[in-house]
Curated annotation (Swiss-Prot):
It holds the Pfam family Methyltransf_25. Its EC number is 2.1.3.-. Belongs to the class I-like SAM-binding methyltransferase superfamily. Cx-SAM synthase family. The gene is cmoA. This is Carboxy-S-adenosyl-L-methionine synthase. S-adenosyl-L-methionine binds at Y35, G64, C65, S66, D88, N89, R195. The keyword S-adenosyl-L-methionine applies. The keyword S-adenosyl-L-methionine applies. Catalyzes the conversion of S-adenosyl-L-methionine (SAM) to carboxy-S-adenosyl-L-methionine (Cx-SAM). It comes from Helicobacter pylori (strain Shi470).
Length: 239
């Protein structure tokens, strides 16, 4: 279903409710440059890591899993038996995910606040365009929990919208991103109304800040797998 949510101002903060869930896949594809390419790239690196670290049934968490797109990408890349656990606090999103993955018997979904979850030891975690919605004071706490729950040589994927630490460059990056959205069919009003709804809800860090945050919780190896203007995909490995 096409995303037309912001044809007019919602007069409220952005939230992942039923209206958003209905159009979320279209919103992702038209709002995140190279979205599916980043999912495939992340799935590839997890698959390669699993090949090099033998586990009879590895556990993979997707936090803020929304409609389950990353699990589809993982199932296309990974041939071995895996356990996939998607956690999201939006039941409308999870209903979409369950519907899309009904033919896979290796995925289950839990409607919870992932900040409150006690994770089992896992081979991989993913936070794909999710950390930016976590309150800044809670990001380090969440990442430390993930680090402590990762098996040795396990990996964490972090996809984020980012900002530049230089005011002029940041303005130019945002302008280019808005041009991208216009080319995807969003009007000036839709872009402005969504920006208004996301204010103080989506709080981006710079690439340097995100890397420093991952290093502060214990990750010694953090790499940017992909970057387009103000979007990036990072991988961090526990050693």
């Amino acid at each position: 279903m096409k995303d037309t949510l912001f044809n007019q101002s919602l007069n409220k903060r952005f939230c992942f409710d039923e209206k958003v869930a209905h159009v979320f896949d279209d919103m992702l594809e038209r709002s995140i440059p190279y979205y599916h390419e980043m999912l495939d790239l992340g799935a590839y690196f997890i698959a390669q890591n699993l090949k090099e670290n033998i586990n009879p049934k590895p556990l993979i968490y997707d936090l803020g899993c929304s409609t389950g797109n990353f699990f589809i990408a993982l199932n296309q890349q990974i041939q071995q038996d895996i356990e996939l656990v998607g956690i999201d606090n939006s039941m409308p999103m999870l209903k979409k995910a369950q519907e899309k993955l009904k033919d896979f018997n290796n995925a289950r979904f839990e409607c919870m606040d992932f900040l409150e979850v006690e994770f089992k030891e896992a081979s991989a975690f993913s936070l794909l365009f999710v950390l930016q919605f976590v309150r800044p004071m809670q990001r380090e706490v969440l990442l430390k929990k993930i680090y402590n729950s990762l098996a040795l040589n396990g990996v964490l994927l972090v996809g984020e919208k980012i900002m530049s630490e230089d005011r002029i460059l940041d303005k130019q990056m945002i302008e280019l991103y808005y041009l991208y959205k216009q080319n995807q069919g969003y009007s000036h009003n839709e872009i402005a109304f969504k920006r208004e709804a996301l204010e103080n809800v989506l709080v981006p860090y710079s690439l340097k800040e995100n890397v420093a945050l991952l290093e502060s919780v214990g990750f010694k190896h953090v790499e940017a797998l992909f970057k387009w203007v103000n979007f990036t995909l990072l991988v961090a490995r526990k050693t």
